[in-house]
């Protein structure tokens, strides 16, 4: 598979410019998803978004990092990116819009991000680095397999693209049952992958 056709997965905590990146990294409007996992009923549905005629080029996710082992197993060709931001900064930013997540959950997601960062080929950037043109243009080329169009950075640099967190929380509540089932299926698949890896080590 050519570099241009390989899907990319960008992972970061909430309030880490993932919504902005889903617009900046898109070769055409709508080509890159944002938190698409919350609309998927299965891991297969999530993965299926990146293959076929109307495929997404990639997605920027704030929760799907918990499935990193399954995604790496089933999408070994996918390019992975991690955006790191301190959990205390994330919690403060969320608090400014009236949301107060548990730090334990944020730390668990951060641990997943750190595991993804250790994978060979993963590109990791800090939240602050996304203010730099050279970093964002490098990230664009890594994800898309081609350089950003002239003036692309300048067009998006001053855009403050953020998720309406109140609407997002309402959506999460409405999809809570499906999301719980998706998480459970991910955990089962992780257990199967771990068991398979253990068998290989024993042999």
Can you say where each PLM-predicted feature lies in the sequence?
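PAPS-dependent sulfotransferase catalytic domain
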Residues: 31, 58, 62-147
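PAPS-dependent sulfotransferase catalytic core
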Residues: 1-57, 151-162, 166
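PAPS-dependent sulfotransferases, especially Golgi type II membrane carbohydrate sulfotransferases
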Residues: 1-7, 114, 118-124, 131-133, ...
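Generic detector of well-ordered alpha-helical segments enriched in charged/polar residues
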Residues: 44-48, 88, 92, 153-154, ...
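Generic serine detector
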Residues: 2, 16, 22, 42, ...
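A periodicity- and composition-biased signal for non-globular, repetitive helical segments
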Residues: 21, 91, 173-174
């Amino acid at each position: 598979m050519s570099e241009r056709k390989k899907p990319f997965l960008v992972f970061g905590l909430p309030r880490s410019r993932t919504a902005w990146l889903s617009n900046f990294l898109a070769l055409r409007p709508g080509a890159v998803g944002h938190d698409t996992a919350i609309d998927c009923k299965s891991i297969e549905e999530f993965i299926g978004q990146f293959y076929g005629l109307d495929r997404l080029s990639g997605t920027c996710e704030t929760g799907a990092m918990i499935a990193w082992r399954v995604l790496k197993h089933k999408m070994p060709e996918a390019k992975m990116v991690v955006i790191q931001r301190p959990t205390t900064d994330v919690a403060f930013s969320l608090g400014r819009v009236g949301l107060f997540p548990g730090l334990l959950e944020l730390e668990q997601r951060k641990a997943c991000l750190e595991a993804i960062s250790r994978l060979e080929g993963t590109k990791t950037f800090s939240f602050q680095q996304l203010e730099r043109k050279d970093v964002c243009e490098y990230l664009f080329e890594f994800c898309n397999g081609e350089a950003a169009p002239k003036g692309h950075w300048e067009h998006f640099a001053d855009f403050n693209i953020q998720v309406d967190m109140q609407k997002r929380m309402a959506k999460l509540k409405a999809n809570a049952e499906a999301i719980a089932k998706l998480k459970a299926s991910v955990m089962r698949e992780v257990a199967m992958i771990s068991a398979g890896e253990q068998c290989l080590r024993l042999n």
